[in-house]
Swiss-Prot record:
The gene is Hells. The modification Phosphoserine is found at S486, S498. Residues 78-120 are annotated as: Disordered. It comes from Mus musculus (Mouse). PROSITE patterns: HELICASE_ATP_BIND_1, HELICASE_CTER. GO terms for biological process: apoptotic process; cell division; cellular response to leukemia inhibitory factor; chromatin remodeling; chromosomal DNA methylation maintenance following DNA replication; DNA methylation-dependent constitutive heterochromatin formation; heterochromatin formation; kidney development. A motif (DEAH box) lies at residues 337-340. Residues 14-96 form a coiled coil. This is Lymphocyte-specific helicase.
Length: 821
């Protein structure tokens, strides 16, 4: 009997139907995901709007509170000044009589003591109903955070307008309070003293903008608010802080006070306190552990003629090491110098400093914004954790850190959201920044010129070989190093390789024996690849860092291969030292002419080995020079700095950028040459400010040497992109603390102003030169001319100068120089 075939359970029609249903399901799921994404985007936008509004309102409360307090104080100050005017007129009428004591401070002190007992409360500024309504509003917003109801943009606009109006009045009050008014009795070195200058500040006369900065710090201190003093480097932030501490002592605050900063800045703090406020006791908290244990006891003792606790000056490292001892002190004022050191929220320094008990905190930094917005938020969170408490929200709203965005994209975003205007409004009560251009009468003008140099033939050969990773073949094949493996199969670290320290003996013969044993291994592990022609040249290739090799090639090919004289076996120093480097060709045209015109020059480089080659060039051209780098002792640094500042024959100062960027004064120079640029633009700016600062009497010109179309140019462009962020956030007209600057905060940044900021450059022209003469005499004259800066300094008013960028390009076909304007 034949078997009957049963019909298939799963038919082709069923399979087709299943596929159609699956496709329909996937399509439906895709649409659901799209809708969910859109819904999430809408909700997240609303949440960010609420958070932004909350931040604006909190900033608004601070501003309104400060404004009311300052207006009250302004009335009292006005009455005091009127009394002082009457006293001045009385002194003129009764010249032979003394109505006050020798210092003329009795009426002032009496008035200030009366004011000291007054108490302020936020209820004087905002009614209870207003505060409760704000709190209720935030509670309602949190309850509705999951809803999709749109938040009215007009509410935020209203808050911004309110903030603008309050901050405008606040800035006017700051400027009015610090209006220059000389004391009719007090004098310092025969010069009249500003009325606001504290009586214990006796070592000099404060400048008008320093008085204004002190008034701003006083306003923050009296109202229990922390802040950031971010004046440009070289404007005297230290003096303003010392004056503020002197003012606090005059008001009856006994201390102690704490100044915390990098080790290199401590001598300057101690010297400035001794110079300007000799009566105020200071304590350098440093030394061995035993020394510091003894010094802790002195913090709690009242000292000196004023019988107050000392101003304690210490370094970041000691503050972290002795946190247990220092955290138990109740500091009246904590000053963190070079505050950008705490830009990383996860670093140990910021964690330890947050534990310090301080009534008020102040950050000093000339570079409040270096790389990204989170660094600025880190500083603000350290000072005001209640206001700046959400980094993600802060970054999500002010997301302009994308360095790839074009100027047009940023302008379109600003037109739509006004995020920059909002950020300026929020930062206003807590940040004060003035530039040298704001105090142009005090500091001579400065111009920065970027000079593009070509690659010479040898540089081109090396550069191409480095990019192709064939550079080692040019100096002979190198034996591959045998890699020693650990028991787990991983390469052993060099630091883990065994060393028998018991073999070390005090006898010279044993030491020589040990050296002879380890020398072969040291030679095998050298990262320097020695070529087959050691008699003719010294080759230095660190093959593990290609980018550094490219930078060295741009600086000078001798950093990779330095020729050696076969007879003397010393480095070969001749004209090829100049002709083998595009930057040296530029220097060789500029430096002799600068010397002839009587200028003194600072040359900054990132690499000490580059300074060595520059020294060889100085010997070749018989230039008298000084040098400063991180390997030099303190006494050597002081000797070389003194020699450069006082000896007219010393023409050049060769300085490593990081070692010479902080804490030194080189105002004898009026020309700066940045031989190679830093990835961080603020490092180069700090280097420039060694000579462009208070005390400089001549215009300053900064020449930045850049090798065209190489990694050198990429570094400069990347640094310029970082400065673009600073231009937008720390706007030069929005944080001056005065009416002329901060009153502009009520206006939005228009598209034209943004475009000027984003596209602002230092160049207006290009110069093409032949290889035989990299710069023509005419172009060299244009490059070195600073007559317009001298006219600007004499006129004491801004004059649009000949700012420019000189792009030196090879033109092998046409030897004639062509100027394109």
């Amino acid at each position: 009997m034949a078997e009957q075939t049963e019909p298939a359970v799963i038919t082709p029609a069923m399979l087709e139907e299943e596929e159609q249903l699956e496709a329909a399901g996937l399509e439906k799921e895709r649409k659901m995901l799209e809708e969910a994404q859109k819904s999430w985007d809408r909700e997240s936008t609303e949440i960010r709007y609420r958070r932004l509004q909350h931040l604006l309102e909190k900033s608004n409360i601070y501003s309104k509170f400060l404004l009311t307090k300052m207006e009250q104080q302004q009335l009292e100050e006005q009455k005091k000044k009127e009394k002082l005017e009457k006293k001045k007129r009385s002194l003129k009428l009764t010249e032979g009589k003394s109505l006050v004591d020798g210092n003329g401070e009795k009426p002032v002190m009496k008035k200030k003591r009366g004011r000291e007992d007054e108490s302020y409360n936020i209820s004087e500024v905002m009614s209870k109903e207003e505060i409760l309504s704000v709190a209720k509003k935030h509670k309602d917003n949190e309850d509705e955070s999951s809803s999709t109801t749109s938040l009215c943009v007009e509410d935020i606009q209203k808050n911004k307008d309110s903030n603008s109006m309050i901050k405008d009045r606040l800035s006017q009050t700051v400027r009015q309070n610090s209006k220059f008014f000389f004391d009719p009795v007090r004098k310092c070195n025969g010069q009249p003293v500003p009325f606001q200058q504290p009586k214990h500040f006796t070592g000099g006369v404060m400048r008008w903008y320093q008085v204004e900065g002190m008034e701003w710090l006083r306003m923050l201190w009296e109202n229990g608010i922390n802040g950031i003093l971010a004046d440009e480097m070289g404007l005297g932030k230290t003096v303003q802080c010392i004056a503020t501490i002197a003012l606090m002592i005059q008001r009856g605050v006994p201390g102690p006070f704490l100044v915390c900063g990098p080790l290199s800045t401590l001598p300057n703090w101690m010297a400035e306190f001794k110079r300007f406020t000799p009566e105020i006791p200071t304590l350098l908290y440093h030394g061995t552990r035993e020394d510091r244990r003894k010094l802790v006891k002195n913090i709690h003792k009242r000292q000196g003629t004023l019988q107050i606790h000392p101003v304690v000056v210490t370094s970041f490292e000691i503050a972290m090491r002795d946190q247990n001892a220092l955290q138990h002190c109740y500091w009246k004022y904590l000053i963190v110098d070079e505050g950008h050191r705490i830009k990383n929220m996860k670093c140990r320094l910021i964690r330890e400093l947050k534990r310090f008990n301080a009534d008020n905190k102040l950050l000093l930094t000339g570079t409040p914004l270096q790389n990204n917005l989170s660094e600025l938020w880190s500083l603000l969170n350290f000072l005001l954790p209640d206001v700046f408490d959400d980094l993600k929200s802060f970054e999500s709203w002010f997301d302009i850190t994308s360095l790839s965005e074009t100027a047009e994209d940023i302008i379109a975003k600003e037109r739509e959201q006004n995020v920059l205007h909002m950020l300026h409004q929020i930062l206003t009560p807590f940040l004060l920044r003035r530039l040298k251009s704001d105090v142009a009468l005090e500091v001579p003008p400065k111009r920065e010129v970027v000079v593009y140099a070509p690659l010479c033939n040898k540089q081109e050969i090396f550069y191409t070989a480095i990019v192709n990773r064939t550079i080692a073949n040019m100096f002979g094949s190198c034996e591959k190093e045998t890699v020693e493996l650990s028991p787990t199969g991983r390469p052993k670290r060099r630091s883990r390789k065994s060393i028998n320290y018991s073999e070390l003996d005090q006898f010279p013969s044993e030491l020589e024996k040990l050296i002879s044993q380890i020398q072969p291994e040291v030679n095998r592990e050298r990262t320097v690849v020695e070529g087959n022609i050691p008699i003719e040249s010294e080759v230095n290739l660190k093959l593990r860092n290609i980018m550094m090799l490219l930078r060295k090639c741009c600086n000078h090919p001798y950093m990779i291969e330095y020729p050696i004289d076969p007879v003397t076996q010393e480095f070969k120093i001749d004209e090829e030292l100049v002709t083998n480097s595009g930057k040296f060709l530029i220097l060789d045209r500029m430096l002799p002419e600068l010397k002839k015109r009587g200028h003194k020059v600072l040359v900054f480089s990132q690499m000490t080995s580059m300074l060595d080659i520059l020294m060889d060039y100085c010997h070749l051209r018989n230039f008298i020079f000084s040098r400063l780098d991180g390997s030099m002792s303190y006494s050597e640094r002081e000797k070389n700095i003194y020699s450069f500042n006082t000896d007219p024959d010393v023409f050049l100062f060769l300085v490593s950028t990081r070692a010479g960027g902080l804490g030194i004064n080189l105002t004898a120079a009026d020309t700066v040459i940045i031989y190679d640029s830093d990835w961080n633009p603020q490092s180069d700016l700090q280097a420039q400010d060694r000579c462009h600062r208070i005390g400089q009497t001549k215009p300053v010109v900064v020449y930045r040497l850049v090798t065209a179309n190489t990694i050198d140019q990429k570094i400069v462009e990347r640094a310029a992109a970082k400065r673009k962020l600073e231009k937008l956030i720390i706007h030069k007209n929005h944080f001056k603390g005065g009416q002329s600057g901060l009153s502009q905060s009520k206006n939005f940044l228009d598209a034209k102003e943004l475009m000027e900021l984003l596209k602002s450059r230092d160049y207006e022209r290009e110069v093409k030169g032949s290889r035989e003469k990299v710069i023509s005499d005419e172009d060299l004259e244009l490059l070195l001319d600073r007559s317009d800066l001298i006219d600007q300094m004499k006129a004491s008013r801004p004059i649009k100068g000949k700012t420019g960028i000189f792009k030196i390009l090879e033109n092998s076909e046409d030897s004639s120089a062509e100027c394109l304007f």
